[in-house]
Amino acid sequence: MFNLLNTYITSPLDQFEIRTLFGLQSSFIDLSCLNLTTFSLYTIIVLLVITSLYTLTNNNNKIIGSRWLISQEAIYDTIMNMTKGQIGGKNWGLYFPMIFTLFMFIFIANLISMIPYSFALSAHLVFIISLSIVIWLGNTILGLYKHGWVFFSLFVPAGTPLPLVPLLVIIETLSYFARAISLGLRLGSNILAGHLLMVILAGLTFNFMLINLFTLVFGFVPLAMILAIMMLEFAIGIIQGYVWAILTASYLKDAVYLH
């Protein structure tokens, strides 16, 4: 473990490296797609945690639920009310399961990434931006399916003077296409920057405390600051999951109601 800690201190980006934990080899076909990597392992862990939260911590027919159940119901109601407020109408419930699942996946993945020596799924921009592109494509297909060519009226704001229409169409089109990247980039860059900051500060503090006895004692001051930053990262992980859910619901509203 000391070697792993020293590796993270000297090279902070190594914590995001995808390593192969178990792999199959064959002289005839490529079996690399079946390898168990840190990325696939932590994805499985996140899915198992989410499943366990809603299967093992049930009410067992009790009138008053456990604290775990009450906290889960609070999260469920929060996302449900947000979805209803953002999308509105009669069909908001059709999209709620997807939004809630996305929130829980990002929320749990961010919390697990705060465990020392763990792996941050949402810090990998290729994965998280790919997920945002899939959501963007789904919204676009939904809008075209529901409205046909009328969907493109989304790029012309109501009441726009005719001379300004070409300029605003270009701006709105660029803004719409930017959603595909910005949704994932916002989350990935926040998690990536936060984890890098913690590792760099922890490495500096660790090396400082090893100098002599005085620095060992005085080093607890920056160590307390690092713990405060870690608590802030916990909050950012939760907030970023909620922001993802809000923006997904907002983009769905544009696709469904064209406003």
Curated annotation (Swiss-Prot):
SUPFAM superfamilies named in the record: F1F0 ATP synthase subunit A
Record-level GO BP terms: proton motive force-driven ATP synthesis
Membrane topology annotation: Multi-pass membrane protein
Cellular compartments annotated: Mitochondrion inner membrane
Effect on the protein of changing residue 171 to M: In strain: D273-10B/A1
Disulfide bonds: none
Pfam families from the UniProt entry: ATP-synt_A
Molecular function terms from GO: proton transmembrane transporter activity
Chief site of localization: mitochondrion
Effect caused by changing residue 231 to I: In strain: D273-10B/A1
The keyword Transmembrane helix is assigned to this record: yes
Keywords: ATP synthesis, CF(0), Hydrogen ion transport, Ion transport, Membrane, Mitochondrion, Mitochondrion inner membrane, Transmembrane, Transmembrane helix, Transport
Record-annotated membrane-spanning stretches: 36-56, 92-112, 125-145, 150-170, 191-211, 216-236
Keyword match Membrane: yes
CC annotations in GO: mitochondrial inner membrane; mitochondrion; proton-transporting ATP synthase complex
Subunit structure: F-type ATPases have 2 components, CF(1) - the catalytic core - and CF(0) - the membrane proton channel. In yeast, the dimeric form of ATP synthase consists of 17 polypeptides: alpha, beta, gamma, delta, epsilon, 4 (B), 5 (OSCP), 6 (A), 8, 9 (C), d, E (Tim11), f, g, h, i/j and k.
Protein family per UniProt: Belongs to the ATPase A chain family.
Protein purpose: Mitochondrial membrane ATP synthase (F(1)F(0) ATP synthase or Complex V) produces ATP from ADP in the presence of a proton gradient across the membrane which is generated by electron transport complexes of the respiratory chain. F-type ATPases consist of two structural domains, F(1) - containing the extramembraneous catalytic core and F(0) - containing the membrane proton channel, linked together by a central stalk and a peripheral stalk. During catalysis, ATP synthesis in the catalytic domain of F(1) is coupled via a rotary mechanism of the central stalk subunits to proton translocation.
Protein name: ATP synthase subunit a
Organism: Saccharomyces cerevisiae (strain ATCC 204508 / S288c) (Baker's yeast)
